[in-house]
Amino acid sequence: QGDKRDICRLPPEQGPCKGRIPRYFYNPASRMCESFIYGGCKGNKNNFKTKAECVRACRPPERPGVCPKTSGPGICLHGCDSDSDCKEGQKCCFDGCGYICLTVAPSGSP
C-alpha cells in the first residue's frame, strides 16, 4: 500500500522520447487526476492510460458525510491530505484556504 501511494506523489514525467500520448497523473496538490503529454518511453509510474485508472489507483477512499459550509477565508493550515488522515467521524475538508479535519454532517444534510 505504501509503495502505491508513493507512486501517486511523483511528478508527471514526459520521458525522453518524442511521442505525444495523452495520459493522466495524480496531482496530490489538487487531489485530482490531471492530463499530461507522455513521450512514449521511460518516465515514472504516475502515468495512467485513463482517468478512471488513475482515480482507482491514487484517489484515497472518501468517508460518508458532508463537509460544513465555509464562512470566510478560513485558516491557512494544511492539516490533512485525505479523509484517512482524520479521526472517525471527520473528513478532510477545504475551509476556504487550507485542508483541515472537520466533523461532518450526515450525508444529504450540508
Curated annotation (Swiss-Prot):
GO terms for cellular component: extracellular region. The modification Pyrrolidone carboxylic acid is found at Q1. The keyword tRNA-binding does not apply. Disulfide bonds join C8-C58, C17-C41, C33-C54, C67-C92, C76-C97, C80-C93, C86-C101. Keywords: Disulfide bond, Protease inhibitor, Pyrrolidone carboxylic acid, Serine protease inhibitor. GO terms for molecular function: serine-type endopeptidase inhibitor activity. InterPro entries: Elafin-like_sf, Kunitz_BPTI, Kunitz_BPTI_sf, Prtase_inh_Kunz-CS, Serpin_venom_toxin, WAP_dom. It comes from the Eukaryota. The keyword DNA repair does not apply. The record marks K18, G19 as: Reactive bond for trypsin. PROSITE patterns: BPTI_KUNITZ_1, BPTI_KUNITZ_2, WAP. Residues 60-105 form the WAP domain. The first domain inhibits trypsin; the second one inhibitis subtilisin. This is Chelonianin.
